[in-house]
Amino acid sequence: MSETRKLAAILVADVVGYSRLAGADEDRILARLRALRSDLIDPTIVVHHGRIVKRTGDGSLIEFRSVVDAVRCAIEVQTGLIERNAGLPAERRIEFRVGIHLGDVV
């Protein structure tokens, strides 16, 4: 059986220090993450033609047709997070660690 392969950019993101943040105030961090996803992250993914492949508790795996779209999406989300974190103490900031890979997917 032949596998169909395609070139894709895969963006993986997770919250830096999620366990620490959740340990301090789990209800608040979950509410903030839901708001970030609905107000910033998910719309930005759509604008840059991404498709959410999988969500984990504190992260996501997202497929893009173009590495340029993946990088632009990551920059826009990170910029939005900087704006939303302004004025918050460091221990309450939600920050994402992001990696992008370009290669064949099945």
Predicted regions and their residues:
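Short amphipathic alpha-helical interaction patches enriched in hydrophobic/aromatic residues
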Residues: S19-A22, N85, V106
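A short glycine-enriched loop-to-beta-strand structural element that forms part of the catalytic core
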Residues: R92-V106
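Cross-kingdom TIR/SEFIR domain
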Residues: Q78, A90-R93
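Catalytic NTP-binding/metal-coordinating core of nucleotidyl cyclase/transferase enzymes
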Residues: M1-E76, G80
